[in-house]
Amino acid sequence: MERIMINPLLSIQNSPTKFLKPPLSSIHRQQQQQERQSNNNTLFMGEARPRRATTFACLSIRRRRNNNGVSEFEETARFEQVGGKGISVLCGLGYWVQGSRCFPWLALNFHMVHSLALQPSTLQLVQYSCSLPMVAKPLYGVLSDVLYIGSGRRVPYIAIGVFLQVLAWGSMGIFQGAREVLPSLVACVLLSNLGASITEVAKDALVAEYGLRYRINGLQSYALMASAAGGVLGNLLGGYLLLTTPPKISFLVFSALLSLQLVVSLSSKEESFGLPRIAETSSVLESVKKQISNLKEAIQADEISQPLIWAVVSIAMVPLLSGSVFCYQTQVLNLDPSVIGMSKVIGQLMLLCLTVVYDRYLKTLPMRPLIHIIQLLYGLSILLDYILVKQINLGFGISNEVYVLCFSSLAEILAQFKILPFAVRLASMCPQGCEGSVTSFLASTLCLSQIVSAFLGVGLANLIGITSSNYSNLSSGILIQSLAALAPLCFMHLVPMSEPVIEKEGKRGISKRSRRNRRVGRVVDKESVTYRRERESEEAQR
């Protein structure tokens, strides 16, 4: 019995007309391709792929296209038709709150120094030990990729992470024992970082998946702007509140912001974003094992592993003395919280400006010389703390407040900016289907290297005798830190010389497997079958 299938491109069934009559020669196919390329300024109804043609309804209008072949008008129309407003509110608020986390952390640092009277090394140990949940980000990413909660695999994880943060910061704001007893305070901070890491992984995966699905550019820039805006406002608000209110008020205000994010997350429906549902498998454990195997295979490639090793080692081998410097600024120099908060604001603005400069001017430069310059500047910028500790700035007529405002955050900003070229490179080389896993693995390894750096700093502070009543050897520790930051320049050969060359699909051609996957429907016709066999034989000869 002859079986006739539906061609979804034409939506016609059981028709005697031969709509897929093959061309006579390969020359005819080349002419048709040239004609299609000459019409690249025409915005036609539907997409080249039938899967996308059934998703959007695009107007037939002539408009100039961008580099990706999608006009700004079409991009805006798609964004509105496929849940763009909902994802803007959900992720925009999420990244803004994520950037605002510096606001309660500033209050927490002052609380641990003044109320709990922690030593500088103990303060730094608590700060970075509580970041351990961030190390497990790849696990959260794999679970979010393969395990559905209800009808979604992104938004429910965002809601769960936000709820954990509300529980942690709300407890520290309401219950005195949760913030006055160190073990309970550490437990609350661990719970908060666990929720933040789950939320960040799910949110990053949602933005990446949505942008790739609908070929919408600029979502990452939008996320960065929202996070930077949250950081600026969070530091301003944190410095102001600490001058007039106790730290618990800052915890409660941030809990209110998280509650707003939780309401938005619970009211968002992932189905409205039009994202495809992955095929269900017999076992979730098998899917997790497969995803972990793919991640392991991806990071073993030299193009990914070598620059990742350099980035991780260059952070881990530098002993961090941020806790000691913070205690010195607040206990010896008696700087107001508003001054420290404003210095963080200036640092966030500097980071945003550096990111824009990199995207426009520095992205095309060879990677190895660029990283070499950034690392050299980072090692030298650490000496700015040496100038502050030795009070050399007063000899030039620069007060401590002005000096901290202008130069205190420079080393921290350069350390963050150094990661950007590596993140761009790894994102451009991620195998298909492993984007979220590889990026979360990068984030977790960088977090682990920062924890190792903090522990080395604690050991160095104890070795040279830095305490809350004795900062005489802090300048020596800063010199050691600066020399350690210059040491990674000795193995710059691990950093690639240039960015990977990504060929466009139109230039490199389409493989036989891709052609086979792009065929739509099937019409039982001897001429069509014969033509397909002849075409495959021609490709094999080529």
UniProtKB/Swiss-Prot annotation:
Family: Belongs to the major facilitator superfamily. Folate-biopterin transporter (TC 2.A.71) family.
Membrane topology classification: Multi-pass membrane protein
Stretches for region Disordered: 24-45, 506-542
Biological role stated in the UniProt entry: Could mediate folate transport.
Gene3D superfamilies per record: MFS general substrate transporter like domains (1.20.1250.20)
Bias-annotated ranges (Basic and acidic residues): 522-542
Keyword flag Plastid: yes
Compartments where located: Plastid, Chloroplast membrane
Signal peptide as annotated in the record: none
Bias type Basic residues, positions: 509-521
Span of chain positions assigned to the transit peptide in the UniProt entry: 1-78
Listed Pfam families: BT1 (PF03092)
Name of the molecule in the record: Probable folate-biopterin transporter 8, chloroplastic
Transport recorded as keyword: yes
Spans through the membrane: 103-123, 132-152, 155-175, 181-201, 223-243, 246-266, 308-328, 338-358, 369-389, 404-424, 446-466, 477-497
UniProt keyword annotations, A-Z: Chloroplast, Membrane, Plastid, Transit peptide, Transmembrane, Transmembrane helix, Transport
Gene Ontology cellular component list: chloroplast membrane
